[in-house]
Amino acid sequence: MNTKFPITAKGFKKLEHELKHLKHVERKKISEDIAEAREHGDLSENAEYEAAREKQAFIEGRIKELEDMTARAEIIDICKLSGDNIKFGATVTLIDDDTEEEVTYIIVGEYEADITKKRVSIASPIAKALIGKSVGDFVEVTTPKGLKSYEVVTVEYKELDL
């Protein structure tokens, strides 16, 4: 897959950090674990060896995945963004039309999304409904609980805590 995907500068640094850690710490540690397990004798019935090999396969797979992701990442510094229209990186405050409760979401890349921290993927239904809207606009979003309607109250572009 060669398609670019948006990611915040902080999100990209987090990917790079994980990649570096896997390559320089975990890879070395798993090699040592495999060598130690080999010393325990017959490999055909060596559970430690099999577990270490499985972990090695997982680590190598994750390294490949992270290398692919970092190669395809389109890094967007949201601190340099501004404007009234909602786009990637926006922190958007909404009012629920039914409950009049205020809710805030941050539109991020799919690998940074974490609903517990109010970070929603740009590919999510709520983000898709919000993109291009501005303060005062109303949006409707289909949720598992049915159709929800929101009014956009604020749009900001500010540093994220990941």
Swiss-Prot record:
InterPro entries: GreA/GreB_C_sf (IPR036953), TF_GreA/GreB_CS (IPR018151), Tscrpt_elong_fac_GreA (IPR006359), Tscrpt_elong_fac_GreA/B (IPR028624), Tscrpt_elong_fac_GreA/B_C (IPR001437), Tscrpt_elong_fac_GreA/B_fam (IPR023459), Tscrpt_elong_fac_GreA/B_N (IPR022691), Tscrpt_elong_fac_GreA/B_N_sf (IPR036805)
Single GO biological process annotation from the record: regulation of DNA-templated transcription elongation
Source organism, top-level taxon: Bacteria
Pfam families the UniProt entry points to: GreA_GreB, GreA_GreB_N
Annotated coiled-coil segments of the chain: 45-74
GO molecular function annotation: DNA binding; RNA polymerase binding
Keywords: Coiled coil, DNA-binding, Transcription, Transcription regulation
Family label: Belongs to the GreA/GreB family.
Functional note: Necessary for efficient RNA polymerase transcription elongation past template-encoded arresting sites. The arresting sites in DNA have the property of trapping a certain fraction of elongating RNA polymerases that pass through, resulting in locked ternary complexes. Cleavage of the nascent transcript by cleavage factors such as GreA or GreB allows the resumption of elongation from the new 3'terminus. GreA releases sequences of 2 to 3 nucleotides.
Protein name in UniProt: Transcription elongation factor GreA
Originating organism: Rickettsia prowazekii (strain Madrid E)
